[in-house]
């Protein structure tokens, strides 16, 4: 690789503020903030709003709608509009 053109790849401490979980991952993100990790070392720090630890798709806390529920809701909503022949 050509020297001087690639960003610095280093361990970075990501903090999911919603779940209060820390991830130590290699990244090229540029940040001026630092924080001491549980291993006692200081790492560049990035705060995240959502990660796999707090996103509903990954945690299984998402609202699931079933086909039966949608059909029942439709029938309930339009029950009074039945055509009389």
UniProtKB/Swiss-Prot annotation:
Q: Which InterPro entries match?
A: Ribosomal_bL28/bL31-like_sf, Ribosomal_bL31, Ribosomal_bL31_B, Ribosomal_bL31_sf
Q: Which GO terms describe its cellular component?
A: ribonucleoprotein complex; ribosome
* Alphabetized UniProt keyword annotations: Ribonucleoprotein, Ribosomal protein
A Gene Ontology annotation in the biological process aspect, one of them, is: translation
SUPFAM superfamilies, alphabetized: L28p-like
GO molecular function terms listed in the Swiss-Prot or TrEMBL record = structural constituent of ribosome
Q: Which Pfam families match?
A: Ribosomal_L31 (PF01197)
Assembly mode: Part of the 50S ribosomal subunit.
Q: HAMAP family in the record, alphabetically?
A: Ribosomal_bL31_2 (MF_00502)
Question: Which family is this protein grouped under?
Answer: Belongs to the bacterial ribosomal protein bL31 family. Type B subfamily.
Name it. Answer: Large ribosomal subunit protein bL31B
Its source organism is Pseudomonas entomophila (strain L48)
Protein's gene:
rpmE2
């Amino acid at each position: 690789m050509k020297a001087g053109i690639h960003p610095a790849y280093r361990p970075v401490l990501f903090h999911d503020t919603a779940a209060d979980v820390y991830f130590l991952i290699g990244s090229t993100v540029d940040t001026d903030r630092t924080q001491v990790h549980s291993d006692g070392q200081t790492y560049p720090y990035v705060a995240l709003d959502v990660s796999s630890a707090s996103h509903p798709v990954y945690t299984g806390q998402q609202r699931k709608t079933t086909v039966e529920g949608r059909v029942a809701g439709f029938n309930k909503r339009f029950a009074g509009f039945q055509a009389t022949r």
